[in-house]
Amino acid sequence: MSKIWKFTSFATISSVAAASLYLYAIDKNGYYYEKSKFKQVTDRVRKLIDGDETFKYVTIDDFVSGPTQIQTRSRGETFKDLWNAEVRRTAQWIYSLGGR
């Protein structure tokens, strides 16, 4: 019985994986694969490494028009805020386990 169960589970997982691959990459000439964000990022990185595409450096002027005041924070303050937000989320989750 154990061998039949192992074979059945292996066959099921293999067929689901094969069907997913077929529907994602082969069916409709790979439409979903070609349009995926993962493929676009991979192609862009490959072009950058090969030197076919140049990396455009952006400055703050590309994002803001006119004079603006930009506030900068230290890395310590940023990490402290992230830590506090995570502690609050954890405490909220723990209290939510208590019910109503």
UniProtKB/Swiss-Prot annotation:
GO terms (BP aspect): cristae formation
Localisation per UniProt entry: Mitochondrion inner membrane
UniProt topology in membrane: Single-pass membrane protein
Transmembrane intervals: 10-26
Signal peptide, first to last residue: none
GO cellular component: MICOS complex; mitochondrial crista junction
Main location: mitochondrion
A Pfam entry, by short name: AIM5
InterPro entries the record matches: Mic12
Record keywords: Membrane, Mitochondrion, Mitochondrion inner membrane, Transmembrane, Transmembrane helix
UniProt key word Mitochondrion: yes
Highest taxon above the source species: Eukaryota
Family of the protein in this entry: Belongs to the MICOS complex subunit Mic12 family.
Subunit and interaction comment: Component of the mitochondrial contact site and cristae organizing system (MICOS) complex.
Main function: Component of the MICOS complex, a large protein complex of the mitochondrial inner membrane that plays crucial roles in the maintenance of crista junctions, inner membrane architecture, and formation of contact sites to the outer membrane.
Record protein name field: MICOS complex subunit MIC12
Source lineage: Eukaryota, Fungi, Dikarya, Ascomycota, Saccharomycotina
